[in-house]
Amino acid sequence: YRGIIHRSAAVFLMAQLVYHAFYMLCSREGKRELREVWLTRRDFDDFFLAMRFNLGMDSKYPRFGRYGYKEKFQYWGATTGVFLISVTGIILWAETFSMRYLPKVVLDLTLIVHGYQGLLAFVILLFWHLYIVHLHPSVFPMNRAWLTGRVDAEWLRQEHPAEYEKLKGEGVI
């Protein structure tokens, strides 16, 4: 049954990926979100500024908008990870068919990449995501945004000051 459960979950995950891609590329809201979550030079500058701040080498901390580098890195890591694990999974699922067109070394590498991508996803979920969403002092015992779709105005002001000021200027807050 393990194989059936694994493949059923894989089909569900790939369907979510396809739906998400269509939503982000074809809907007005999705296109707006894609622009917001797109990695820019500023995200890398913010990352290094935050590292300098955390090491006591700078007194300034980045002023994040709707998404900071953490959210963007996590989003793109998850999206590319799901794409990679889907492609390698399809190749492995159709192993006999794949062997007709691909050299054995490609299948061997596909098996390695598929396994390590799954392990990497598990480790990132266990440590990074668990800390940011549940254990970080600003959200402990959990960030309720996943339940309500909303964040507290004070939390927004502290964690994403540029977004807070934008929304305040628009009269939303």
What positions do the PLM features span?
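Membrane-embedded alpha-helical bundles that constitute the cytochrome b-like, heme-associated redox core
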Residues: 1-173
